[in-house]
Regions:
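Histidine/lysine/aspartate-rich catalytic loop segments that bind and position anionic ligands
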Residues: 110-136
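Transmembrane-helix boundary/entry motifs in multi-pass membrane transporters
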Residues: 168-169
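Short alpha-helical scaffolding segments that buttress acidic/His motifs in well-ordered protein cores
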Residues: 57-61, 71-78, 91-97, 126-127, ...
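Strongly charged, low-complexity linkers/loops
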Residues: 132-160, 164
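Mobile cap/lid helix-loop segments that border enzyme active or cofactor-binding sites
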Residues: 2-84
């Protein structure tokens, strides 16, 4: 969490070097096409929408196309088919990114959280490792559930009940899934 939020992982620091599109195998091409033609491809400036080699985690997924395709399909479902509103889903993602010091996910999803309507002050507090002071009830439920899940590897009955009362069983499952995936 010591890196500034605007800093993005560089290609030079990648352990898996980008594979030029013309060097993809048939199986890798299927995966690349699935990523680019799915909902991620419509997200402006995303790793899936940029021309050239796939970036972000998708570049790594190319090394095992069958597994990579399963993972990217799961990720697309968690991100784009969740019962949680995009702002809350992105909030869970950035809480997870900060908890695990995942610079790429923070870089990719902090902007998306703001675009989905998250107050910039909430993002700044999370970036600094602080519990945001001013959150809506829904935001507080997602924040508390996510932090507790990561810090204790479980959630208390009280935290679970708050999430269940507000989001229902599907929402709780979607919240668990987004935290686990990211």
């Amino acid at each position: 969490m010591n890196k500034p939020e605007s800093e993005t992982p560089t290609v030079q620091s990648q352990r898996f070097k980008p594979i030029p599109l013309e060097n993809l195998t048939a199986e890798q091409r299927v995966l690349a096409d699935a990523v680019r033609s799915g909902p991620r491809g419509a997200v402006k400036n995303s790793a899936a929408a940029k021309p050239g080699p796939l970036g972000g985690p998708f570049n790594v997924f190319l090394r095992s196309p069958d597994i990579g395709n399963i993972i990217q399909s799961l990720g697309a479902a968690i991100r784009f088919r969740s019962s949680l509103p995009p702002k809350l889903n992105e909030l869970a993602i950035i809480v997870t990114a900060r908890q695990w010091t995942s610079q790429y996910e923070w870089f990719a999803h902090h902007r998306l959280a703001l675009e989905a309507g998250l107050d910039p002050a909430i993002g700044e507090d999370i970036a600094q490792g602080r519990r945001p002071a001013k959150m809506s009830e829904d935001e507080a439920i997602v924040y508390d559930f996510s932090r507790e899940l990561h810090e204790t590897q479980g959630v208390s009955d009280a935290t679970y009940q708050r999430a269940l009362d507000r989001f229902g069983e599907r929402g709780v499952m979607d919240l668990i899934a987004v935290n686990g995936y990211y």
